[in-house]
């Protein structure tokens, strides 16, 4: 593909730094999806009970954000997350997908569909399953003190590409 000469403009180093800074700030500002406090790479909530305009969708994201996970670079259940993104327990991923499918009505339903497609089909970081060898679980909890995790592998092209390029 050839770019026409009239579409190319030389700019100064200062102008380039201005535009680079602007792009970086845009990325920081867009960490959560409009209408939500929890859907995205961060959260904007001041406390656990705060939800955005699309409260049903936001509730799904909030629950998912507080689910069992292994942050990038950390080890849990004998499994080290060497990827760029947080790795989630497969039970959490299943519950998150079902929650998003249950969000219907108005514009909130299509927004939940967008989150679901983006998260699972594009991002698709994969997840882990925990086996509890002793079959002994802590009282009133699903935690397994001697659990061992196995990774399912990336499910979406985006996560696969990012993890390969950064690894």
From Swiss-Prot:
GO terms for biological process: arachidonate secretion; lipid catabolic process; phospholipid metabolic process. One of its GO terms (cellular component) is extracellular region. It comes from the Eukaryota. Ca(2+) binds at residues 38, 40, 42, 65. One of its GO terms (molecular function) is calcium channel regulator activity. The keyword Secreted applies. Glycans are attached at residue 102. It is found in: Secreted. Expressed by the venom gland. The active site is at residue 64. Its cofactor is Ca(2+). Binds 1 Ca(2+) ion. It catalyses: a 1,2-diacyl-sn-glycero-3-phosphocholine + H2O = a 1-acyl-sn-glycero-3-phosphocholine + a fatty acid + H(+). Transmembrane segments: none annotated. Residues 136-140 form a propeptide. The keyword Lipid metabolism applies. SUPFAM superfamilies: Phospholipase A2, PLA2 (SSF48619). Coiled coil: none annotated. Disulfide bonds join 39-61, 60-99, 67-92, 90-127, 132-144. Keywords: Calcium, Calcium channel impairing toxin, Disulfide bond, Glycoprotein, Hydrolase, Ion channel impairing toxin, Lipid degradation, Lipid metabolism, Metal-binding, Neurotoxin, Ryanodine-sensitive calcium-release channel impairing toxin, Secreted, Signal, Toxin, Zymogen. Its EC number is 3.1.1.4. Heterodimer composed of a large subunit and a small subunit; disulfide-linked. Belongs to the phospholipase A2 family. Group III subfamily. Phospholipase toxin, which may catalyze the calcium-dependent hydrolysis of the 2-acyl groups in 3-sn-phosphoglycerides. Inhibits both skeletal (RYR1) and cardiac (RYR2) ryanodine receptors (calcium release channels). Probably blocks ryanodine receptors by generating a lipid product. This is Phospholipase A2 imperatoxin-1. It comes from Pandinus imperator. The lineage of its organism: Eukaryota, Metazoa, Ecdysozoa, Arthropoda, Chelicerata.
């Amino acid at each position: 593909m050839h770019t026409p000469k009239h579409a190319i403009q030389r700019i100064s180093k200062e102008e380039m730094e201005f535009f680079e800074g602007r792009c970086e700030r845009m990325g920081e500002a867009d960490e959560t999806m409009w209408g939500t406090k929890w859907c995205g790479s961060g959260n904007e909530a001041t406390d656990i009970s705060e939800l955005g305009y699309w409260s049903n969708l936001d509730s799904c994201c909030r629950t998912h954000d507080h689910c069992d996970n292994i942050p990038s670079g950390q080890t849990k259940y004998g499994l080290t997350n060497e990827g760029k993104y947080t790795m989630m327990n497969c039970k959490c991923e299943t519950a998150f997908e079902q929650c998003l499918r249950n969000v219907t009505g108005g514009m909130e339903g299509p927004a939940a569909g967008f989150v679901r497609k983006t998260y699972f089909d594009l991002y698709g970081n994969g997840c882990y399953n925990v086996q509890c060898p002793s079959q002994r679980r802590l009282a009133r909890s699903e935690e397994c003190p001697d659990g061992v995790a196995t990774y399912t592998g990336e499910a979406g092209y985006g996560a696969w590409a990012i993890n390969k390029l950064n690894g």
